[in-house]
Amino acid sequence: MLDFAQLPPEVNSALMYAGPGSGPMLAAAAAWEALAAELQTTASTYDALITGLADGPWQGSSAASMVAAATPQVAWLRSTAGQAEQAGSQAVAAASAYEAAFFATVPPPEIAANRALLMALLATNFLGQNTAAIAATEAQYAEMWAQDAAAMYGYAGASAAATQLSPFNPAAQTINPAGLASQAASVGQAVSGAANAQALTDIPKALFGLSGIFTNEPPWLTDLGKALGLTGHTWSSDGSGLIVGGVLGDFVQGVTGSAELDASVAMDTFGKWVSPARLMVTQFKDYFGLAHDLPKWASEGAKAAGEAAKALPAAVPAIPSAGLSGVAGAVGQAASVGGLKVPAVWTATTPAASPAVLAASNGLGAAAAAEGSTHAFGGMPLMGSGAGRAFNNFAAPRYGFKPTVIAQPPAGG
């Protein structure tokens, strides 16, 4: 602390009048008071919400934990609001102390006038006629000195009292201190994962760089490398595989079905070679079984054919020669029934059948008998209705019997 009594009034007055005044201090006081009001409102709202939840629908251990964690925060808000209000009050007190010291300080122009008057009196004091005036001027200057020193001492004391503030306490910790360590571990894992991802990115780039082995080689060597599929590789559109060209690409496509080398190469090779090979082995086993049973089947077939050949001479005399001769004698002598050619024996042994008999045998009325036939044989009677045949049980018409006929096709008109 300065000893203001040792300083002339010119210095003390200059110090008081040179500052920005009480404006900044009053603005700080208003800010502290606004902060105190905001903290009080927040604490009241927070307390009302917690009380409403705890006394209302939210019950149980989780509600109790919430109340236990939130209550210290509400208390801290109220305490901090009180401290902010006190800081605002102290700032107002400091501003008031400054105003009081400012009004108690001698204005610098008055001090300058006193000094100028003294200099003039001294300059014109030839015969000592200005001695009394000089003493009065010096006494006035001493009063100014004492007045400024008292004002500065009072202002220093008031300012020291205004700066006596209670320290602000931090809010109670409600987080888990171990969370920082866990977060650091997570960050480490993320960095490691990024390094692995970078390695996975660098490896394909390095492999892709191998495709430029023959970049600075002679043209004939470059063409040979492309023909063999050692260069000219390109990545697929989605970057999942390497498309191989040249002879190597043809070989890869023949083995896997595609010229692209990716994660599915193993499965494609299995599906193209291993699975068909297993199917071929299964078929070979079936063919082997057939080849094993074929001699036995051939032996049984030959034995059956030999027995049939031995029985043929005994079966020949049983063939009715009359039937054969009749058939042989009728060759080239077909009879006509309507527009069709039929064997002659049909017309010689089969009498004409009346429409009424046909209608009765078919279960139809007279109208149906008069209606024209629509089947292929027209009005020709069935073979079973003729006389002198071997099938005598069909010689007479059978009532209620419905014969099966072939319908006339559309192509027949």
UniProtKB/Swiss-Prot annotation:
It comes from the Bacteria. Disruption phenotype: Knockdown of this gene in cells with simultaneous deletion of PPE25/PE18/PPE26/PPE27/PE19 genes result in a severely impaired growth in phosphate-limiting media. InterPro entries: PPE_C (IPR022171), PPE_dom (IPR000030), PPE_sf (IPR038332). GO terms for biological process: phosphate ion transmembrane transport; response to host immune response. Belongs to the mycobacterial PPE family. This is Uncharacterized PPE family protein PPE65. It comes from Mycobacterium tuberculosis (strain ATCC 25618 / H37Rv). The gene is PPE65.
